[in-house]
Amino acid sequence: VFKLEGSDNIKLVVDELPNFRTRDLVVMWGTIEGEPFYFLVSHWPSRLGGKEASQFKRDACAKQIKEIKDELIAQNPATKVIVMGDFNDDATDASITKVMGAKGKEKELVEGDFFNPFNQMLRAGLGTLAYQDVWNLFDNICVTENLVNAEEGKLRIIKGKKFYGNIFTRPYMLQQEGQYKGYPLRTFVTNNFQNGFSDHFPVYIYIGK
């Protein structure tokens, strides 16, 4: 059971655009079975105007999240940090792998690193949203190395049959026919109500001992 100790919202800053407004970073902290956890939830700026032209905005978010994580680990190396959200970048994009420093393989991890279990899932052809028949994986959950290489008896990320990450899908969540068969069933297409749930599939991980 997660015991909440506090929460806050942090303004995401893009240095090149001091007046730029985007969604805040929502954070909360507390304990699970006595172990310190810190959660960050973030929805990064869109690719409006093109991926490359808007990249610096998402890079700024990634940089700020890494700085927060580094400070938390420096203060208490036992803190287990989890960041999640729609990053509007794929798990293999440089904003996540380079700027935020999230590694895709356990063997690459060093103390304090982020691990992104969805990196290998994207490389295997899985995704949470599709555009022009190409799957993307913008929805990520990254955890600090101490949730991968946890001490015996401590909480850790649990691996499934093949991956540490999971994408939740059910038939009622899928477009059943037409050009977009197999895509997530959206709530709206332009102004037309589709009675769907989202244009993204949700993602999740398991934490246990």
Spans of features found by a protein language model:
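Structured beta-strand-rich core segments of catalytic domains in phosphoester-bond hydrolases
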Residues: V1-P36, L40-W44
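Extracytoplasmic, non-cytosolic globular domains
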Residues: V26-M121
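Second-shell loop/turn segments in exported
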Residues: V14-E16, G49-R58, V83-M84, L126-L129, ...
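Intrinsically disordered, low-complexity segments enriched in polar/charged residues with Gly/Pro
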Residues: V14-L17, K69, K181-G182
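Metal-dependent phosphoester-hydrolase catalytic domains
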Residues: F20, I73-T79, D89-K209
